Amino acid sequence: VLDAATKAVFQSWGPGRYDAYFNHDGKNAPVLIPPAYGLRDVALETYTGEGPISYWNSYVAVTQMHGQGSFNDPRLGINIVAQPDRVTPKLPVLRDYQLTLEPPQPPAGSFDPIAAERGRVVFNGSGRCASCHIPPTYTDAPLLHAPAETGSDPVLAGRGTTGRYRTTPLRGAWQHPPYFHDGSAATLADVVAHYNTTLLLGLTAQQQADLVQFLKSL
């Protein structure tokens, strides 16, 4: 049974957000739940790259859902042993299923194809997007990046085990605003504007608009 204070914290998160570390460190800093699709061939599937998706499935099942299973991560100081372990044997087939989930295709008419082609040039060139969001997965995982590299909020990275963020894959990005792990960018235009300012890209308004159309096409 939840006490009133804990219940109030949970209710404060709102739809689409979750704090998987709250019951570990007691801090209230929920993040957006990332998409479960488009993870095939992506080396690290979580924001902070602690491990493969089976690691995260195990963490959530045991530490969050209180499933009867074992979970051990010395980096977090967690060592839960259950007998019998009803979680670990299920992880491989769950991962296999998750990796079959394809990103949704953009609806017809939802982007300007001519502008998107111009945006592709910006993406691969002056926008420097492809230096980290490398096609066809649009990530450079297993590389991880310090928050300061991209002007990202450092809170989640500091609560995890790596202190860094993976590069989020972009396929299906049109479908899940807001953006960044903390939801600080309401639209893809806001994402582009953030990087244009943070990385001193010097993109024109037209280049930024074209880049948004390309992102909508993925």
Regions found by a protein language model. Name each.
Residues V1-L218:
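Periplasmic c-type cytochrome electron-transfer domains
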